[in-house]
Amino acid sequence: MLSWNNSWHSSSTENRTMEREIVASYEPKKNNEIRMFESSDEMATDLAEYISQVSEISIKERGYFAIALSGGPLISFMRKLCEAPYNKTLDWSKWYIFWADERAVAKNHVDSYYKSTKEDFLSKVPILNGHVYSINDNVTVEDAATDYEFVIRQLVKIRTVGVSESNDCPKFDLILLSIGSDGHVASLFPNHPALELKDDWVTYITDSPVPPPERITFTLPVINSASNIAVVATGEDKAKAVYFAISDGTEGPDAPSIPARMVQPTDGKLVWFLDKASASFLEAKTKNDGYEHPKY
């Protein structure tokens, strides 16, 4: 069910007022939610509040907040966290940063997700350098994937990163993803053999259809084991992929090949953050009732 509110609606979350012109709640599958926004600023504001609350709950329950990031425009949406009140109220000392995927380039390369994340986010908040787990750029892509999985396994042993109760996969508190126009998430592309991996936590590819060809990526079991997953989509070029990923009305061979459709938390919650353009293919039912912003 997709419900819309086309009028301004205010709701309070942790003493913070959130306002949006278009908001949606999508619940075709258990623990899935969809949110739509009129502007990028509204999306960034809501995403910051969402990340803040997941962080606070994770630190309260576990003593840590382990978040894995991806590339694309989503890092720019995290800039709100560098501003008041978050830059002062969040317990940055408990944050641990990982990457759900990375391009096999030097850290100072223009294509590096680490570089863009450092410039747009990490350099602006007091996260400890020792809590930032970037991917080794001094070895082959295969060795980098092996090394990264080893690092994560050590952190799971001491529970800096949680562990799934249903399998032995790491249970990140939040994995933040973007979606490509072809429906890829992280560096998991349509019809790629990496989608079939069950036992590996981190893998590598050398044939990405989007340059650069060599990449490191979390596997689907790791992504789906997270406590929280957020997928951010912007732009009309993502509309078809978003539709195939989340609409129950999709049929035929295209739907199963969309990696984003395979993102279904085992024991967690999935939230989609969409602008109007990326949500334009979705069938929506207009309602006049208000929408209460959920608490996490």
Curated annotation (Swiss-Prot):
Keywords: Hydrolase. It holds the Pfam family Glucosamine_iso. Pathway: Carbohydrate degradation; pentose phosphate pathway; D-ribulose 5-phosphate from D-glucose 6-phosphate (oxidative stage): step 2/3. The keyword DNA-binding does not apply. One of its GO terms (cellular component) is cytosol. It is an enzyme of class 3 (hydrolase). GO terms for biological process: carbohydrate metabolic process; pentose-phosphate shunt, oxidative branch. Belongs to the glucosamine/galactosamine-6-phosphate isomerase family. 6-phosphogluconolactonase subfamily. NCBIfam families: pgl (TIGR01198). Hydrolysis of 6-phosphogluconolactone to 6-phosphogluconate. This is Probable 6-phosphogluconolactonase 1. It comes from Oryza sativa subsp. japonica.
